[in-house]
Amino acid sequence: MADDAGAAGGPGGPGGPGMGNRGGFRGGFGSGIRGRGRGRGRGRGRGRGARGGKAEDKEWMPVTKLGRLVKDMKIKSLEEIYLFSLPIKESEIIDFFLGASLKDEVLKIMPVQKQTRAGQRTRFKAFVAIGDYNGHVGLGVKCSKEVATAIRGAIILAKLSIVPVRRGYWGNKIGKPHTVPCKVTGRCGSVLVRLIPAPRGTGIVSAPVPKKLLMMAGIDDCYTSARGCTATLGNFAKATFDAISKTYSYLTPDLWKETVFTKSPYQEFTDHLVKTHTRVSVQRTQAPAVATT
């Protein structure tokens, strides 16, 4: 009996610390597949070290121009990519800059069904939030036949959707920025989420779903207001993420200063991209010879 109790409540078991971090409110972090699996193996491999598996050991071979520039250290930070609005198509770019500080959390896993001629086809939809608690946050949604596949896909999509978060002050500009710079509103479906600056020390006054995203974004103090069907967790999370991503959409007076326009990395490192593209294409065309008898 002692072994069974240790397996069920240990760090790697289905009843480990992962459940304690997700709360137990209706439709929330703790009402996912863990309750339906009942220890039959669906909840395994959810720890930090279990995700990724052998894929993390392989060397990253970038397939996009942006990926080649990042791997060759031509782009020094993620902010350079955001400055020129370059689309990020490889999650390894995010891992390259933020890999050590990124934390992810499964917000919800819900079954969805599709009616076919053969009957109902059930798949699982995973909502995953990811952030470094210091100005970067992302949200990923993935649907798959298996829970583990859905979570892995949602983590990759969350990394690709990471946006910078602009922080500001409620009153005097003393200390580090701690709240949203202005009132921002995000919407998804019928859900409308409004973020309002708050004094230092207030904390995040919101429901559990926006609170988790705001904490991952690095916002310490914030008032929130929500309207619509907030019981729909997916729309609630997407509306909050939409509001957070709009913090850089407003040109406030402190950003009115003239800036010097510089070349895009694609223009600045054109010669380097031509060389690396030639080298990569040669490696791909030189296939190993196959012995025939």
UniProtKB/Swiss-Prot annotation:
The modification N-acetylalanine is found at A2. The keyword Membrane does not apply. One of its GO terms (biological process) is translation. It is found in: Cytoplasm; Nucleus, Nucleolus. There is a cross-link at K275 (Glycyl lysine isopeptide (Lys-Gly) (interchain with G-Cter in SUMO1)). Residues 7-34 have a biased composition (Gly residues). Keywords: Acetylation, Citrullination, Cytoplasm, Isopeptide bond, Nucleus, Phosphoprotein, Repeat, Ribonucleoprotein, Ribosomal protein, Ubl conjugation. There is a cross-link at K54, K58, K275 (Glycyl lysine isopeptide (Lys-Gly) (interchain with G-Cter in ubiquitin)). GO terms for cellular component: cytoplasm; cytosol; cytosolic ribosome; cytosolic small ribosomal subunit; extracellular exosome; focal adhesion; membrane; nucleoplasm. It comes from the Eukaryota. The modification Phosphothreonine is found at T252, T270. Signal peptide: none annotated. Citrullinated by PADI4 in the Arg/Gly-rich region. GO terms for molecular function: cadherin binding; enzyme binding; fibroblast growth factor binding; mRNA binding; RNA binding; structural constituent of ribosome. The modification Phosphoserine is found at S264, S281. SUPFAM superfamilies: dsRNA-binding domain-like (SSF54768), Ribosomal protein S5 domain 2-like (SSF54211). Residues 1-56 are annotated as: Disordered. Residues 35-51 have a biased composition (Basic residues). Pfam families: Ribosomal_S5 (PF00333), Ribosomal_S5_C (PF03719). Gene3D superfamilies: 3.30.160.20, 3.30.230.10. Component of the ribosome, a large ribonucleoprotein complex responsible for the synthesis of proteins in the cell. The small ribosomal subunit (SSU) binds messenger RNAs (mRNAs) and translates the encoded message by selecting cognate aminoacyl-transfer RNA (tRNA) molecules. The large subunit (LSU) contains the ribosomal catalytic site termed the peptidyl transferase center (PTC), which catalyzes the formation of peptide bonds, thereby polymerizing the amino acids delivered by tRNAs into a polypeptide chain. Component of the small ribosomal subunit. Interacts with zinc finger protein ZNF277 (via zinc-finger domains); the interaction is direct; the interaction is extra-ribosomal. Interaction with ZNF277 competes with the binding of RPS2 to protein arginine methyltransferase PRMT3. Belongs to the universal ribosomal protein uS5 family. This is Small ribosomal subunit protein uS5. It comes from Homo sapiens. The lineage of its organism: Eukaryota, Metazoa, Chordata, Craniata, Vertebrata. The gene is RPS2.
